Curated annotation (Swiss-Prot):
Subunit structure of this chain's protein: Part of the 50S ribosomal subunit. Forms a bridge to the 30S subunit in the 70S ribosome.
Pfam families named in the record: Ribosomal_L2, Ribosomal_L2_C
Location of the region described as Disordered in the Swiss-Prot/TrEMBL record: 218-277
Gene Ontology molecular-function annotations: rRNA binding; structural constituent of ribosome; transferase activity
Protein name: Large ribosomal subunit protein uL2
Basic and acidic residues bias (residue ranges): 264-277
The keyword Ribosomal protein appears for this protein: yes
Length: 277
């Protein structure tokens, strides 16, 4: 999928880019796989803002994605490649030979008419899903499970990929995009290939309005707020923070504080941290 560049006919168009959607084959989703989505605008059941900078935007339907890929031995044909407003990756509509329809994350190189299959005996081919123990060393994968049968949780964003490095007993070593090397059970499934639509990260929004269409509201700096709204607020003119370190709106340390639980049980499964050389 290529990048479309606009002429600077207005200030908002200057430097604006978008995807050309050349890979998209239809604009009409499969109705049986749609679920309504209610806009929460970042509020909880009490009406209080729990997630800032959310609200407005275009209405969306949620597409039911098959992250489990557990129909072993049943072949499926790719019917369409579609846009999904709920994620950066594109999705593919597949029709199984037993009549079931499903959406999957569209990997790079997947084409309409291509046949895919899941199961331990599946070929090492883009779009096929297998247990990690059955995938050769060096293979690039995505949509990786953390618990067998739960469905893919890792490596699902556009352009993301991970690589199988080896096997240690019942675990398989996988290098994630961040550089982290992690042990994952060999019975967990993964899909062959890299997630498609990798150029979406190169898009220049161009104007604030495009963010509002996506439901993203403005981010206001704490230093321009009043002191009752933010610890950085108040003062005359461009005043400094006035604290030893920058703070969140709720007075917690910001910028650099580690938030991971020091007693996380999954620590023993991380062979190499993402920030280690």
């Amino acid at each position: 999928m290529g990048i479309k560049v606009y002429k600077p006919t207005t200030n908002g168009r200057r430097n604006m880019t978008s995807l050309d959607f050349a890979e998209i084959t239809t604009s009409t989703p499969e109705k049986s796989l749609l679920v309504s989505l209610k806009s929460k605008a970042g509020r909880n059941n009490n009406g209080r803002i729990t997630v800032r900078h959310q609200g407005g935007g275009h209405k969306r339907h949620y597409r039911l994605i098959d992250f489990k890929r557990n129909k072993d031995g049943v072949e499926a044909v790719v019917k369409t490649i579609e846009y999904d407003p709920n994620r950066t990756a594109n999705i593919a509509l597949v029709h199984y030979t037993d009549g079931v329809k499903a959406y999957i994350i569209a990997p790079k190189g997947l084409e309409v008419g291509q046949r895919i299959v899941s199961g331990p005996d599946a070929d090492i081919k883009v779009g096929n899903a297998l247990p990690l123990a059955n995938i050769p060393v060096g293979t690039v994968v995505h949509n990786i499970e953390l618990k067998p049968g739960k469905g893919g949780e890792l490596v699902r964003a556009a352009g993301a990929s991970a690589q199988v490095l080896g096997q240690e007993g019942k675990y398989v070593l996988v290098r994630l995009q961040s550089g982290e090397v992690r042990m994952i059970l060999g019975t967990c499934r993964a899909t062959i290939g890299t997630v498609g639509n990798e150029q979406q990260s190169l898009v220049n929004i161009g104007k604030a309005g495009r963010s509002r269409w996506k439901g993203v509201r403005p981010t206001v700096r704490g230093s321009v707020m009043n002191p009752n709204d933010h610890p950085h607020g108040g003062g005359e003119g461009k005043a400094p923070v006035g604290r030893k370190a920058p703070s969140t709106p709720w007075g917690k340390p910001a910028l650099g504080l580690k938030t991971r639980n020091k007693k996380a049980k999954s620590d023993k499964l991380i062979v190499r941290r993402r920030n280690e050389k």
